Structures are given as C-alpha cells and as structure tokens.
Amino acid sequence: MAVDVPQLVAQAREGRPRAVARLISLVEGASPQLREVMAELAPLTGGAYVIGLTGSPGVGKSTSTSALVSAYRRAGKRVGVLAVDPSSPFSGGALLGDRVRMSEHASDPGVYIRSMATRGHLGGLAWAAPQAIRVLDAAGCDVVLVETVGVGQSEVEIASQADTSVVLLAPGMGDGIQAAKAGILEIGDVYVVNKADRDGADATARELNHMLGLGESRGPGDWRPPIVKTVAARGEGIDEVVEALEKHRAWMEERGVLTERRVRRASHEVETIAVTALRERIGDLHGDRRLGALAERIVAGELDPYAAADQLVADITEA
C-alpha cells in the first residue's frame, strides 16, 4: 500500500521516530516510492554534520559512539546514529547489538538509533546508507554518527560517506600495523586510541604518530589528524574528541573542503545508482534475443567481446 510521503516527511521533521523509521525502511527496502522519498527529502538536507567511526572489532566503537551521543546531547544537539552491522548469512538480518549497547539513549527523543545490514557489501556500508543519512539529515539531526563494521582490507568506504572520519584503535591489538595494511591511515581525520587505561596505550599512540608522520606530505595550513586517547566506557577523553571533530569541521568550512567532500559524496552516490540501474537493465536482457545474437557472433568470430559490450550499452541507453 502506498504511503503519503509528504506527510511522512513532515512527521519526521517534527521528530516523530516512527516516521523516521518508516522512511528508512522505504529506502532500505528499495520501495517503489524510493524516488518520491528522495525528491521530497532533497531540499531539506545539508544541515547535518556526518561523522564516520570505524575500527577493528573490539576497539570499543559502539561504546565510543554512545559516549559521543551523550556529549553532543549535553550540547543540545539532535543526534542520529546509523549502526551498520554484518548481515547474517542465513537470515540477512542485522545483529541489532547497538540497541543493547546504546540502551541509555533509547528514551531520549533527541536521539534516533537505527541498524542497517551490510548485505554482503564489501565496503562495510549498507548500500542504502547514503539515503538513510539523508533521511536523518532531513529529520533535523544536527549530527549523524555512522558506525561501521570492522576496518578489514576493503572497508574504507566510510571516508566517502562522512564529512569527518574517525579511526578507533586500541592497545595490544596490533592495530597500528593492521591500519596501515588496510589503508586506514589515508582516510582518518581524527584518530582515537581507546581503552587508554590499558598497558601499551602510549606506545600505540606513538606508533600511530610515527606512521602518520611517515606518510605525511602536508603543506602549511593543511589538516594534521590529531590523536586522542580515551577511555570511552568512563567517558574520559570524549570531550577532547568532540573538540577535535569541531576543529576539523571549522577547518573544512573555512577552506571549502566540506563542500568539496559533499560534492564528491553526491557524485559517488549518483555513480552507484547509475551502475545499479545499468546492471538491472543488463539483467533484464538475459532472456533477450539481442544478447544471445551478440554471443553467437562472438563465438563465430564475427565480433569481439568489447565491441559486443559497446553494442549492448548502446542498445540499453537508446531504449
């Protein structure tokens, strides 16, 4: 049954959590009304500061996210949290662990928490995450925190979806070397060494500082990622993280970097949507005689695969 999208958006703007949940469900489920939802949201976006948090499992991402929510709420900010969880290989459902970890915010009308499954997407972000960020932005969130699954070798996509990327590490986990391997040192705007009350925290911070220095080719006025030590479970160092985040935001706004990042993000989003649409069109051709005819010409040596692909793309774009 079709929903009244303008009314739903108006309710979301009023801060009604059910309306926000319904909009994200429409987005995540690729509803036939997806385009209508996006068109309605477009003029209402651009006000939220999007912060991405990533790091290996066990570094305390969810605890840190919860602590950041508390800090921003103390400052009177409305906060949205998008927790991207691994999909179950059997049910395809998100683990929803963040609901338990962030239960202290459950009754706060100024906080909206949502889980999204990665659905096997190697970048670590759910394919619908960019649209879900737009929903939270349009719903009046001042800050949107996007917490992703562990960094891994290919999970650096958060950098393309956030205004500021926070990389979390912890002592005794070999995170410094792992971060370098995963290319994380290239995407972090702020680095957090959590669980700083453990042995090895200072050494981890020094190692990270050394590695950042090795890869440094910054000029005067360029952003130099700070390293902040925290004990998120006790809220220690969280105010310093917020201070670092706000400094980075101010630096980006002053130099036009924030707009550049958002334009790049929108470009990536358009490209993803276009590629998905083309894949769907190509999938529709599997039973089409044109594809079979091209394949037969390749086998007969009359056509090479690249020329056939060019012909296929031309047919699709002209249709």
Q: Model segments located where?
A:
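Short hinge/gating elements
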Residues: P6-V9, M116, Y191-V193, P226-V231, ...
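Alpha-helical scaffold elements adjacent to nucleotide-binding pockets in ATP/GTP-utilizing enzyme cores
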Residues: L95, A132, E157, Q161, ...
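Long, well-ordered amphipathic alpha-helical subdomains in the mid-to-C-terminal portions
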Residues: K229, E240-T317
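Flexible active-site lid/hinge loop adjacent to a nucleotide/diphosphate
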Residues: P171-D199
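Canonical P-loop GTPase G-domain recognition
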Residues: V190, A196-W251
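Generic secondary-structure signature for well-ordered alpha-helical cores
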Residues: E14, S25-P32, P43, R74, ...
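Generic beta-sheet signal
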Residues: L82, L168, V193-N194, T230
